[in-house]
């Protein structure tokens, strides 16, 4: 991706509530399922513009919460969004090179940049004793229609749930619980993105055209099979396997 392509992509994806599927209910389910304490040390790895950070801050007002995001303008959006929360700090940096220790690491749709096994192995070094991780990752269900396969064509590493579980276990983690994100969680991402694309279309120059077309293509592929385009939300803890 050239610098111009990257700038166009960031323009298209700017000023929307989130950069991937998810709902506040998903965050609450993970916090409850992993029994994350009121004063826990929490990290949102790949926090984007801060949608889930906001939910974490509201759910655990006494916790120490950090977000890390590699893309500066998304980190800036998160800082602006969380400016009223005194217990939240947003850092611009690499989620693969953490320096703190955390009781709970949350990562919505971002661990695939590192690889599931690789990311969990790295993050294990930053987990406090008794700590846990929640992350969402694409899965391709057996018998998925062609539309779902087309949606994930640019992610050849995708696997089914059994394959995802194997990647978790290869990092020395046990699965505590898991569930698929709802269609509403996907709509929470794609509906604002579709509205953003429509607004930009009105006065778009040629430089934005490829990024707009790609966003429209992605949304169209999702709409073709919304029940089969799937993220699995995984709750995991270090086990007795390799670390």
What label would you give each PLM region?
Residues 20-38:
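Conserved alpha-helix/loop element of class I SAM-dependent methyltransferases that forms part
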Residues 96-105:
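A short acidic, Gly/Pro-enriched loop at the edge of an enzyme's catalytic core
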Residues 137-155:
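Short, glycine-/aromatic-enriched active-site segment of Class I SAM-dependent methyltransferases
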Residues 118-132:
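A short glycine-rich, Lys/Arg-flanked "PGG" loop and its adjoining helix->strand segment in the class I
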